[in-house]
From Swiss-Prot:
Gene field: rpmE
Pfam family, one: Ribosomal_L31
Keywords: Metal-binding, Ribonucleoprotein, Ribosomal protein, RNA-binding, rRNA-binding, Zinc
Keyword Amino-acid biosynthesis: no
Signal peptide positions on this chain: none
Known partners and oligomeric status: Part of the 50S ribosomal subunit.
Protein name: Large ribosomal subunit protein bL31
Cofactor (UniProt): Zn(2+)
GO terms (BP aspect): translation
Cofactor note: Binds 1 zinc ion per subunit.
Molecular function terms, GO-annotated: metal ion binding; rRNA binding; structural constituent of ribosome
Binding sites annotated in the UniProt record for Zn(2+): C16, C18, C37, C40
Source species of the chain: Actinobacillus succinogenes (strain ATCC 55618 / DSM 22257 / CCUG 43843 / 130Z)
Amino acid sequence: MKQGIHPEYKEITATCSCGNVIKTRSTLGKDINLDVCGNCHPFYTGKQRVVDTGGRVERFNKRFSIPGTKK
């Protein structure tokens, strides 16, 4: 690698809005704030909600189906 052209790889602190602090390394060079992390993201905590589409697929198929065809 050429010397002097690559950014410095420094240790930074990523702080989540839930209070979790993660130490990592980055070329960014400054600490960052996160909205979600592995401790508070709904997918990882098991508190994920299922969004009910309420028959939207059936409504779409009804609107755009070709008349005279059956499955």
